[in-house]
């Protein structure tokens, strides 16, 4: 019997999970308490999209395979010694092995399939049988911090859009987008922070209401005319969650000859079965059809995606700055016959890659104490250590003022190779001397400079043609394991869906110890350095210059790097 024919072991409406706060340990040390708390934090109802189903974000991105596996992971982390390592296979704890104190306490592999079988059809069959779990990026690797996790990256993208297309001034301009889930929900706040107004189309009213409660969206509308009136009449940037179907609304704007200034999308188009509502379907009808005829759902969803992408292309032809925001909607439309679906660029090659060349990406940390003051103190420390970056300081000020913490207090801050280790050492010292009430964990999104291969997103259009080479995230995971990250993860299919990406993650616990300081020195240098290495190897001059300045040893490039010092 499959788990969908019987009672679904992934669903338990009686559960409410929240991470412990304070200094009292359930585990034997902070090195095992840290992954325990972050796993639980991923399932906090203030953090996760559907916590009763173990779904954290991104369609069906889960923290554990089922509730039995979750309970067993918790049990093992509570008894795990500091010379043991827990292995987790697609959300299931499968082994505990002797290692050493500087090895990772947890090693995670999620959603990985042999390439020939790396598609949604095969994954869904395994998923039905309880043999796999979709880990997305930070869901199954236990370092999701709510929508804040993508706010700064989205903000940086919109700032870059304003610079490239509007001479740096977004005043009076507006963005059209779709999706207000765990990732897409960051768009309205990021957009208004960057000076744009925004209409974000969402078919699930509960998601709009959640973004209203948490301050990520300003107003709700139930018709396009109402949404347009709100942004037209406002003297300041305003965001509107519009209840509707993205394909319908995007097409209506084309028909009415209304052209936004910027067009993008963050629906869960990467997962046509679970993540995208076909035109003309209700939420309840879609839920029923997923149980009755999965193929029909996928077919209808992809057909609607094609309609939406065609509308995006039409709006682009009328002058809208149009970009793919990494959900693989262009690929889905291409498969449905929209031959020029890739005529608008992905956000990474268009706006983010120069940052990746310097190892700059979504560095994040969380306060295991649960006390917001610990985050505010680390915010100030970042300003002290990076004094000459007013853009970064402005971000930290806006984040404190406008971003509500979800679950354990956390912060996202895009910094690169030259700063990550320094910040980690400073945070560790703050724990050691008692400035912070409990240890800090430092991690990142898998969307980072050296940790992902995703030809339709992070590695789209690499200058040497190496878009699909996935050796790089494997090397990143191996190096972070060797360096002593507290937990390391290796996933497949995050962001863009099965068959289209491989990526790795790491988290390191700053517990104030000298051993932690040594691990931080290795991990928080090596991790971003792999991104600089990867881009230098692909031929990017910015990356080569950074490699030379930071003294990286890249055997095939060292002679060239000497000339750049």
Curated annotation (Swiss-Prot):
Catalysed reactions listed for this entry: 4-imidazolone-5-propanoate = trans-urocanate + H2O
Keywords: Cytoplasm, Histidine metabolism, Lyase, NAD
Principal subcellular localisation of the protein: cytoplasm
The keyword NAD is assigned to this record: yes
PROSITE patterns cross-referenced by the UniProt entry: UROCANASE
MF annotations from Gene Ontology: urocanate hydratase activity
Active site positions: 413
Binding site for NAD(+): 58-59, 136, 182-184, 202, 207, 245-246, 266-270, 276-277, 325, 495
GO biological process, one term: L-histidine catabolic process to glutamate and formate
Function: Catalyzes the conversion of urocanate to 4-imidazolone-5-propionate.
Name used for this protein in its record: Urocanate hydratase
Organism, scientific name: Vibrio parahaemolyticus serotype O3:K6 (strain RIMD 2210633)
Gene: hutU
């Amino acid at each position: 019997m499959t788990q969908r024919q019987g009672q679904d072991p992934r669903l338990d409406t009686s559960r409410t999970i929240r991470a412990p706060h304070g200094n009292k340990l359930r585990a034997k040390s902070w090195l095992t308490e840290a992954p325990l708390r972050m796993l639980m934090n991923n399932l906090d109802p203030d953090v996760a999209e559907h916590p009763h189903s173990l779904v954290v974000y991104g369609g069906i991105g889960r923290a554990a395979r089922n509730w039995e596996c979750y309970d067993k992971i918790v049990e093992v982390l509570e008894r795990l010694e500091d010379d043991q390592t827990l292995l987790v296979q697609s959300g299931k704890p499968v082994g505990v092995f002797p290692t050493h104190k500087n090895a990772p306490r947890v090693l995670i592999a999620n959603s990985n399939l042999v390439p020939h079988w790396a598609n949604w059809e095969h994954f869904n069959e395994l998923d039905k049988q309880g043999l796999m779990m979709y880990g997305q990026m930070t869901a199954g690797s236990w370092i999701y911090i709510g929508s804040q996790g993508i706010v700064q990256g989205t903000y940086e993208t919109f700032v870059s859009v304003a610079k490239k297309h509007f001479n740096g001034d977004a005043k009076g301009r507006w963005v059209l987008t779709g999706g207000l889930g765990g990732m897409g929900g960051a768009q309205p706040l990021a957009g208004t922070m960057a000076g744009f107004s925004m209409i974000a189309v969402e078919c699930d009213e509960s998601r709009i209401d959640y973004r209203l409660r948490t301050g990520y969206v300003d107003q709700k509308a139930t018709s396009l005319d109402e949404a347009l009136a709100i942004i037209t009449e406002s003297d300041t940037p305003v965001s509107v969650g519009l209840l509707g179907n993205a394909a319908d609304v995007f097409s209506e704007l084309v028909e009415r000859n209304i052209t936004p200034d910027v067009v993008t999308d963050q629906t869960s188009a990467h997962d046509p079965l679970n993540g995208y509502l076909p035109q003309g379907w209700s939420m309840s009808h879609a839920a029923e059809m997923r149980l009755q005829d999965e193929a029909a759902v996928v077919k209808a969803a992809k057909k609607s995606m094609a309609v939406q992408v065609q509308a995006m292309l039409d709006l682009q032809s009328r002058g809208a700055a149009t970009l793919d925001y990494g959900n693989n909607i262009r690929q889905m439309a291409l498969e449905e016959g929209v031959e020029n679906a890739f005529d608008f660029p992905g956000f990474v090659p268009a706006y983010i890659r120069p940052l990746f060349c310097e190892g700059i990406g979504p560095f994040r940390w969380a306060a295991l104490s649960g006390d917001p003051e610990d985050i505010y103190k680390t915010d100030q420390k970042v300003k002290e250590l990076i004094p000459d970056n007013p853009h970064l300081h402005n971000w930290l000020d806006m984040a404190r003022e406008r971003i509500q913490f979800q679950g354990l207090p956390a912060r996202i801050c895009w910094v690169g190779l030259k700063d990550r280790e320094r910040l980690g050492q400073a945070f560790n010292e703050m724990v050691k001397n008692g400035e912070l009430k409990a240890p800090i964990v430092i991690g990142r999104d898998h969307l980072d400079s050296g940790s992902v291969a995703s030809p339709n997103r992070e590695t789209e259009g690499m200058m040497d043609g190496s878009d699909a080479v996935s050796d790089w995230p494997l090397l990143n995971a191996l190096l972070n394991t060797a360096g002593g990250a507290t937990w390391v993860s290796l996933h497949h299919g995050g962001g863009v869906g099965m068959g289209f990406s491989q990526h790795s993650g790491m988290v390191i616990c700053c517990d104030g110890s000298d051993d932690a300081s040594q691990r931080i020195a290795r991990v928080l240098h090596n991790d971003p350095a792999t991104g600089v290495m990867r881009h230098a190897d692909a031929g990017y001059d910015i990356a080569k210059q950074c490699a030379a300045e930071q003294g990286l040893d890249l055997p095939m490039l060292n002679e060239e790097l000497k000339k750049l010092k």
